[in-house]
Amino acid sequence: MRYALLIASAIALLLSSTPILLADETVSIGGSNAVLLRPTAPRASVILMPGGDGYIAAGPGGTIGKLKGNQLVRTRNAYLARGLAVLVVGADVNLARAVDYMAAIKRPVTVVATSKGTLRVAHGIAGGAKPDTLVLTSGFLTDGSGSRQNVANILGSPRLLPRTLVVAHRYDSCRFTLPAGVEPFIRWAGGKASFKWLDGGTDSGDPCQARGHHGFNGLDSEVVSAAAGFH
């Protein structure tokens, strides 16, 4: 009898610590499709904004047709496994509406953007989006990153910037997201931003694509751990 009770207790503990997941679904945010993944009882929400042209080709039933190799797209289920409600958005989704949508599911809402997605999130925040926190990975941060198009220049001042985490690879060789842009961004943010350096992993192919250090190839768990824990 005692053994049976111990087994029952262990099963109950396992079930209570494992999030119950709903089926992936395609949802409309202001007329644009996005992909929603969520547990029945999320502890927080994340909005994932991939790089490149930003178009994920969200199809029926939560399918994603493009940018499947993008670091944020390929790790979306890892955020879900951590008990987070996850919204993967394309470039055509209005960020302010996306934040409001996820806030209705569970706050805090963290936007995680990578590469060119960091430009889109900056425009979204400048346009009125108000996430609780922000994570920028392989970001177009400052002029030191290698491009005049960057988060600091788009926002102009850190007044609208939420609490922010920068995740960067020490050896990112993409000419638009160079490591040299990180420390100037931290100074510009005036106490609103912190940073995490990663190194290691595998570097191959185009230095601005997902298989290089720019895309944290081989370091997905480290990126997810940092981003999912920042809220």
Where are these regions (language model features)?
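Alpha/beta-hydrolase active-site loop
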Residues: 70-72, 88-106
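A conserved short beta-strand
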Residues: 129-143
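Gly/Ala-rich beta-loop-alpha elbow adjacent to hydrolase catalytic centers
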Residues: 112-121
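N-terminal cap/lid segment of alpha/beta-hydrolase-fold proteins
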Residues: 22-41
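C-terminal catalytic histidine-bearing segment of alpha/beta-hydrolase fold enzymes
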Residues: 192-231
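The feature captures the conserved acid-bearing segment of alpha/beta-hydrolase catalytic domains
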Residues: 139-200
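Bacterial N-terminal signal peptides
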Residues: 8-17
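Short, surface-exposed "cap/lid" segments of acyl-processing enzymes
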Residues: 40-78
